[in-house]
Amino acid sequence: IRDFCLSRGLGDVYKRQNVESLLHKQRFITTATIDPAVRSARLPEDRFLESLSALVTQEVGKTLGLLNNYAASTAYSTANLRSAKFTSEHGLAPSIMDGEFYNYVAQPSDKGVRLINNVLGEYDRYAIEWGYRYFPEEEGDPAREAKRLVEFVNKKVANPIYRYAPRQTYSVDPTVRTEDLGDDHLMSSTLGMKNLAIIRSQLGQWIQNDPDS
């Protein structure tokens, strides 16, 4: 199970090789300062399965029709992403479809904070309900069902956790980026760079006997 990566077809998730190396590199550079378990040349089994579950959940989301939602990661404040209580209740973003699985803003002093986003968020459940909810009282009338769906969306439109935005091609919205976290991008980036500086200074001690190092 450690030696495959994922691609998606219509209703299928395909297995290929080498996913462990990818997950290890991503998790190491984002969480090694706060999680001693990943300071090795290979992920421990429990950390690997956590990371794999995040990747599989996202791919299964795509088979259900969920699109990548790059607005989700700015719904929560950068400060809240350092809170053990907040992250245990809400995860790192309201959608697993945003693309950033790991809490790179968490600092070594942030004890108990959630480090991985591997469960469905509030936006995901909302999008699945929109796509699959059945209205038996509307007797299959598409116009009446469409009206109900519009009402469903309008109830959530003012709440930022239900915001959706696709990958940008030509426009530039700083709140819609891939692999970002938090509502304050400058602060999140500063915290992430602090972690990278620590990792760089400790790399020789944390990773030993690695043929690629």
Please place each PLM-identified region on the residue numbering.
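Preference for solvent-exposed, low-hydrophobicity sequence contexts
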Residues: 26-35
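Short pre-active-site segment immediately N-terminal to the catalytic Zn-binding motif
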Residues: 38-56
